[in-house]
UniProtKB/Swiss-Prot annotation:
It holds the Pfam family zf-FLZ. The lineage of its organism: Eukaryota, Viridiplantae, Streptophyta, Embryophyta, Tracheophyta. A zinc finger (FLZ-type) spans 266-309. This is FCS-Like Zinc finger 11. Belongs to the FLZ family. It is found in: Cytoplasm; Nucleus. Interacts with KIN10 and KIN11 via its FLZ-type zinc finger domain. Forms heterodimer with FLZ2 in vitro. The gene is FLZ11. Induction: Up-regulated in response to mild as well as prolonged energy depletion. Induced by NaCl.
Amino acid sequence: MLKTRAMFPHKDQAMSLSLDPQSDLVVGHTNNRPITNPLALSLLIGLNNKNKCISDSDFVRSPKSPLEFRVLSTMADSFFLRSPRSSLTAHLNCCCGPAAKVGLSIVDSLGDDRCLLPDIVFGPALRIKCSEVMDKHPKLLFPVANKSKKIENERSGVVFEIGDNSSETEPVGLRNRSFSANDCLRKTRVLSRSKLGQEGDFPGSGSDNAFSSEDDMEDYTCIIAHGPNPKTTHIYGDRVLECHKNELKGDEDNKEKFGSVFPSDNFLGICNFCNKKLGGGDDIYMYREKSFCSEECRSEEMMIDEEDLEEPCIDMHESLKKLF
């Protein structure tokens, strides 16, 4: 009986130490082989969650462990959750202070009205201040009021003086007015400085200085259209004068006057001394932009020019003798 009782504990111990045919789990016995059965691994997961007796490093040793995501999660706590950007931002905050203040200061400066650029004033909005001469003669080419209006910009502090027109009820823009050829002639002569002393029929014209300021103004523009229907347009400030006829009657006189100074188109086709026609193969002799057929004609022209130059020299010499 004692032998049989002694054998039962050995049988129970042998049964407890036997292996499960469905799993490789060993109870109470250390096995050095790696655990590859997924059922056994699932049991180990439960044991790890309940008893905390198996560490994560034990599961890493198994090449087929389904708990690799747990290892990655533990590694992400130290590596992936702490991004380089966050670490760099923390380092900059420790060294240089918070960088958000710099960006906010830039945004605040952009939103500030004082940092805006000054207003741009275009040409039509700007006028030239009237001179004292035009104040004395208000009935010149165009009526101009004596007072000026000051426009002040509150932010930029720039002040412009703008001349007011007497007709304030007229719409803004260019106001076209057509005149006859005589009126256009009479009024446009004022704008020519070379004709100021010759013309005296214009009202208010007393001296050349009275209209010199108008000729120098930047608001005046003259447009001359040539062709079968010549037309001259005078733009003075915001006023337009249109003349449908060529009012410059002295154009032909000017051509005759300056014809001797400027050479004609066919100045190489004729001799300037004997009026001989010059062909394409003939020799041409030049002197002061004049063509000659021979050296004799050119020398004769040169002698005539020398005589013309000697006469004023002789007169000057005689006048000097009288003085001394």
